[in-house]
Each structure stands twice: as structure tokens, then as C-alpha cells.
Amino acid sequence: MGMKKDLLLVLTIESVVLGVVLGFVIRPFNPSNDTISLIGFPGEIFMQIVEMMILPLIMSSVISALAQVRARDARRIGIVTIIYYMITTFLATFTGIILVSSIHPGDPELIHELGEGTLENTALSTLDTFLDQIRNMFPENIIQATFQQVQTEYMPIKPSRVRNATSMNMTSEVLHKQTLTYTNEMNVLGLIVFCSGFGIILSILGDQARLMINFFIVLDAIIMRWISALMWCYPIGILSLVCKNIIDIDNLTETAQALAMYVVTVICGLMIHSLLTLPLLYFLVTKKSPFAFMTGMLQALATAFGTASSGATLPVTFRALEENLKIDRRVTRFVLPLGATITMDGTALYEAVAVIFIAQLHNIKLSLMDLVTISITTTVASIGSGSVPAGLDTIVIVLTTVGLPAKDLSLLLTVDWLLDRIRTSVNVLGDSFGAGIIHHLTRSSLLEADTDELIRQIREDIDILNNPHQDTLPISHHSVQSTIQNTQNAMQAPHVYSKSARASFAPIPNEEERKALLKESIALNKSDTHIV
């Protein structure tokens, strides 16, 4: 198994490198559109397969995880998760602002070299984006939320005739009306909220909902087994995606030279956040080596770079955290889907740098209040950027908020293919460190819950064993030995653990064996508690 993991890691990293090399080798030959389509076709099919798995993966993982924790533990995990994500997103934005203000990559002379931008302004505001996220948290139709989400749009209405007081001429004024529309994107945030509530209620119901809990546990195991097989397709898909993106870029050399300092600024900011800020935060909380943690995440980071999608990387991130780093699956299955939806550290940093860079291009001096506004709006806007490959729409909102021209943002599209992949890797790393920190902070309460559950199950077993008319254990119960064994398995391999995965029938031990098993279980509980 270890050799297979290492081989898959090597193949994933090699696919990224080979995709870049092939892209630059093929570019000078100016391949036709049909050739480019054929090169990118495996990557296109790969992304469709991965996106097909996102919906069942999120629903089964969130519900099965929260159904196996106490309500108060779920509440604590949720609160700590939100606090962590808000802190890291703000730190990323702050890093970007400090760096771009210090390096000052935006030279007004570049406007003559790059030409005028073509992107249109948007009437959307930061408030619109924030309210859209609140609306999407509570979808009116859960089925519709699987393929659509709400988005505010401003539609032009019939122009009104306005009299000009100075010239007395009639002029036309274009007005816009705010409307709510639906875009064809999965409402991941709404699904997570629904599944979280569903899972918590299942946990409260306990044995009354055991059949439903078992269903989602098994469904989660099926999806992960399926994805484990599909992971061998990741290297081919990543190679195809990276190669096609490099071939598709127009005027790569000229624009890259003009925007070199901008690219360096963004990459430096992302490196500082991922190699200094996040590891330091992880070390301060857990007192463990962050670099050993990052080593276990190499395949997930390479996949994030290749796909430029936090959502597509989600299965690999689950596997890396649960199997390589032994993070409790009840933490990963809630923290990671939420992080892939609302937490975009790399995107927030990138947006802050891009906005101030455009201001520098136009030689616009930003006040302290402008910088504060940028930090707040980029934090809020990055939350709405979703788990799919990021676009530049959210930056337009930030530019409009501080009164900067949004049209010049199109000049950055040429280098966005590279920066998008790097910032996606940073997003995934931030989510992963968050899972590690939250696992550390909640481990004692989760172990306490496991101990209470184990004691309750043992008492039920003893009551059944004391029944003289019972020859074998019924399907709904299990032996003390199987309880102990499953608890030990849970500590060693939380990824494959299921509290319901017990033997259907087990022989009844005699009185001495029963007492010995009970003592063993109590000793196990004490040792597990002392681990914390």
C-alpha cells in the first residue's frame, strides 16, 4: 500500500512537470484548434468525472461525520473552524497589502506597454455578494441547490428622460434594476448547511436513526473506494489540463515580461503565507512540526496545482489527511468541504495585490481607509469565490467598491493561469492546516465522546449477556470483544472506521471471559484518555 501511495505521488508531480514542459515545447509549432482540443480532451473528461463525484462526496462525508459526534462537539468544531478561517483569510489579505505596497510593482508606464483593458465594470457591490452568500446558505429548494445557486444581477430597464437644467436638452439616463437570478453552479454552501443540520439531528436521535446513520456511513465508504480507484486517472487529466492551458495563452512572452514584477509580488506573498504564516500558526497551536505535516500533503498540493480547483482536489485532500496524517475523519469530513467553499486564503491575497497593482498603474494614491476597505472587501469577496477554478469576477467587485477602473483587470488574464494554480494550492494547504489545528483542539472531546459511547455499548452488552435465554447476540448488538476491537481500529485508521461495522453474530463469553473483557475495555478507555 505504501509503494502504491508513493507511486501515485510521483506520477502526480511528474504529470504537472511534464504538462508544463510539453506545453512550452508544443507552443512554437502553433497547433490548430482541433489539435489543442484533442490535447485538452482527457483533462476535460477528467474534470467532469471529478465534478460528478463532488455532490455525493460532500453529502455523504458531512452527514456521516456529524452523525457520529455529539451535538456540542459539532458546535465546537463549527465555531473553531469559522474562527480559524476568518483569521487566516485576514492574515493573507494583510500580507498581500503590505507586500504590494512595499514592492510597488505597478509602474504607470506599463499602461502604454500593455494597452487598454476591455473588462466592463459591474454594478454589484460587496454587500450584494455577502447577501448572496447568506441566501445560498438557506436554499428554498434543496434539489435545485444541487445544480443552481442564487446570484444578484442588475438588469437595464427602459431609459428615463431627464431634463438638463443648464442646456434644457433631454438626455437619456440608463437605469438598472436589481434582480435575483439563478446560475448553473452547485450551491455547495447551501448543501453543507443542510447536510450539517441533517447529520446533527441524526446524532441526537442516536439509536432511533441507526439505520439511516449506517446508510450514510456505507455510502461514504463506497464513494471513497470509488474515488480511490479514480485517483490513478489524476496524472493523465492533470497533464492534459496543464499542457492545454499553456498552449492556449496568447502573447505569453511579451505580457509576462511586462507583468514580471506583479507575478513575483503575488508569488512571494503566497509563499510567505504558505511557508511562514500557516506553519507558524500550526506550530503555535499544536507544537508539532508543520513541515512534516506539509510532506504528507504533497500529492494534494500537486493535484491542486494541476486542476486549479479546491473542489476537484477534495478527495485527494481527504485521503492525505486521514491516511497519511491520521486526522480524525469526523473533523476532515466537515472542515474540508466548508473550507473548499468559503476559505480562499490564496485568492484573498491575490485579489488584494491585483487591486492595489491596478491603482499603482494609474498612479492613484490609496488612503489608509481605502486599504482598510480593500482588506474587508477582499475577505468577503473571496468567500464567494467558490470551489471551482477561480475567475476574476470577485476582483471587479473590490475595484468598484474603491472606485478603481475595472477594465484594466483583463490585462492580468495572461498570467492568471499560473497564479490561479498556485493560489489554489495555497487554499488547499490552508484548509489542511485548519483540519490539523481543529483536530488537535477537539481531540480530547472527541475521545471523551468515544469513551462514553463505548461504555454505553458495553453496558448494553452486559444486560444482554445476563439474559439466560439468549444463546447468541442479535444483529442489532455485538460482543464486548468486537466493541474493543473496533475502538482500537478507530484509533489506528479513522478513515475506514465505522461504529456500525460489527459482526452480526458473536458467541457469548462465559462469566470469567466477560469480566476479563470488561476490565480490558476499561483499561483501554483510560489509556486512550491519557493520550490527550
UniProtKB/Swiss-Prot annotation:
<feature type="transmembrane region" description="Helical">
    <location>
        <begin position="46"/>
        <end position="66"/>
    </location>
</feature>
<dbReference type="InterPro" id="IPR050746">
    <property type="entry name" value="DAACS"/>
</dbReference>
<keyword id="KW-0813">Transport</keyword>
<dbReference type="GO" id="GO:0015175">
    <property type="term" value="F:neutral L-amino acid transmembrane transporter activity"/>
</dbReference>
<keyword id="KW-0325">Glycoprotein</keyword>
<comment type="similarity">
    <text>Belongs to the dicarboxylate/amino acid:cation symporter (DAACS) (TC 2.A.23) family.</text>
</comment>
<keyword id="KW-0812">Transmembrane</keyword>
<feature type="transmembrane region" description="Helical">
    <location>
        <begin position="182"/>
        <end position="202"/>
    </location>
</feature>
<keyword id="KW-0769">Symport</keyword>
<feature type="transmembrane region" description="Helical">
    <location>
        <begin position="352"/>
        <end position="372"/>
    </location>
</feature>
<feature type="topological domain" description="Cytoplasmic">
    <location>
        <begin position="1"/>
        <end position="5"/>
    </location>
</feature>
<dbReference type="GO" id="GO:0005313">
    <property type="term" value="F:L-glutamate transmembrane transporter activity"/>
</dbReference>
<keyword id="KW-0472">Membrane</keyword>
<dbReference type="InterPro" id="IPR001991">
    <property type="entry name" value="Na-dicarboxylate_symporter"/>
</dbReference>
<feature type="transmembrane region" description="Helical">
    <location>
        <begin position="83"/>
        <end position="103"/>
    </location>
</feature>
<dbReference type="GO" id="GO:0015813">
    <property type="term" value="P:L-glutamate transmembrane transport"/>
</dbReference>
<dbReference type="InterPro" id="IPR018107">
    <property type="entry name" value="Na-dicarboxylate_symporter_CS"/>
</dbReference>
<feature type="glycosylation site" description="N-linked (GlcNAc...) asparagine">
    <location>
        <position position="164"/>
    </location>
</feature>
<feature type="topological domain" description="Extracellular">
    <location>
        <begin position="104"/>
        <end position="181"/>
    </location>
</feature>
<dbReference type="GO" id="GO:0005886">
    <property type="term" value="C:plasma membrane"/>
</dbReference>
<feature type="transmembrane region" description="Helical">
    <location>
        <begin position="264"/>
        <end position="284"/>
    </location>
</feature>
<feature type="transmembrane region" description="Helical">
    <location>
        <begin position="6"/>
        <end position="26"/>
    </location>
</feature>
<feature type="transmembrane region" description="Helical">
    <location>
        <begin position="222"/>
        <end position="242"/>
    </location>
</feature>
<dbReference type="Pfam" id="PF00375">
    <property type="entry name" value="SDF"/>
</dbReference>
<dbReference type="GO" id="GO:0015501">
    <property type="term" value="F:glutamate:sodium symporter activity"/>
</dbReference>
<protein>
    <recommendedName>
        <fullName>Putative sodium-dependent excitatory amino acid transporter glt-3</fullName>
    </recommendedName>
</protein>
<feature type="transmembrane region" description="Helical">
    <location>
        <begin position="383"/>
        <end position="402"/>
    </location>
</feature>
<feature type="glycosylation site" description="N-linked (GlcNAc...) asparagine">
    <location>
        <position position="169"/>
    </location>
</feature>
<dbReference type="InterPro" id="IPR036458">
    <property type="entry name" value="Na:dicarbo_symporter_sf"/>
</dbReference>
<keyword id="KW-1133">Transmembrane helix</keyword>
